[in-house]
């Protein structure tokens, strides 16, 4: 990672691995992580330890086999369950014990999803966010938050979506990534929303886009123009349904078109080779 002022965050090993027909072994994930480290991404999300046995094994093996020079590993997981303290939740404990210096938590930011999917109150969801971030920070880990379905939630209840962002920041999250989970946003509306959230909360914002409307890369780039300093995506745009924002295209757009260095120069010169090397592992064309 060049410095902490701008994050390139890869989620190939977790979100990208959800693509139909893509079945990565632990050994595959270790190889891909080494390629991403060559590129010089800031963070590599390794998976969900505790919830997915293969990902638990990845973090165990990574501790002894993965010598990252440029990137840092991140563990992905959820906030604590309703009615259970973060210190008593075994899935939160698995994040703590993963060995990853960074944890990215996913949390509901759409009021209807809190009520219908989590089957809890809006207040308890905020408490879950606060408690989990506070606990992991106390354990010495850096915490990012993925605000799931944020843009749909902001349309439905902007006040509550903003409460989620504020709760995360006040608890100690370094970044709140706004997620276009359904991939339905258009660039103009997305950029306007990012600006509004930044102005209302003062949070350091990230962006996580899916490509269902073929706007994943464009939406990521306009989010940066609107103030986001943390971009998420996957190698070759891998991901469920239509895929995630192609992180290689995002990096090229930022560095070659907009003049913003986000990975080392030797990394970007090798990006085409790295894209094809990863496709050899996944057996999915770039």
Question: Which residues does each predicted region cover?
Answer:
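Catalytic cores and adjacent flexible loops of soluble metabolic enzymes
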Residues: 1-286
């Amino acid at each position: 990672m060049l410095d902490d002022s701008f994050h390139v965050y890869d989620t190939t090993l977790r979100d990208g691995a959800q693509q139909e027909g893509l079945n990565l072994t632990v050994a595959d994930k270790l190889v891909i992580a080494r390629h991403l480290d060559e590129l010089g991404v800031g963070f590599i999300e390794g998976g969900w330890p505790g919830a997915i046995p293969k990902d638990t094994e990845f973090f165990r093996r990574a501790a002894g086999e993965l010598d990252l020079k440029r990137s840092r590993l991140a563990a992905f997981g959820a906030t604590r369950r309703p009615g259970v303290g973060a210190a008593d939740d075994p899935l939160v404990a698995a994040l703590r014990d993963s060995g990853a210096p960074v944890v990215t938590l996913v949390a509901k930011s759409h009021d209807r999803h809190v009520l219908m999917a989590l089957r809890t109150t809006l207040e308890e969801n905020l408490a879950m966010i606060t408690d989990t971030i506070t606990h992991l920070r106390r354990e010495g880990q850096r915490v990012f938050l993925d605000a799931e379905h944020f843009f749909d939630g902001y349309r439905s209840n902007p006040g509550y979506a903003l409460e989620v962002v504020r709760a995360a920041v006040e608890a100690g999250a370094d970044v709140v990534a706004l997620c276009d989970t359904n991939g339905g946003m258009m660039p103009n509306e997305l950029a306007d929303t990012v600006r509004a959230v930044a102005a209302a909360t003062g949070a350091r914002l990230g962006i996580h886009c899916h490509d269902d409307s073929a706007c994943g890369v464009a939406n990521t780039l306009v989010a940066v123009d609107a103030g986001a300093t943390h971009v998420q995506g996957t190698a070759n745009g891998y991901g469920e349904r239509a895929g995630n924002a192609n992180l290689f295209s995002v990096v090229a757009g930022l560095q070659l078109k907009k003049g913003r260095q986000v990975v080392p120069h030797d990394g970007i010169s090798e990006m085409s080779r790295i894209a094809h090397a990863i496709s050899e592992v996944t057996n999915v064309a770039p």
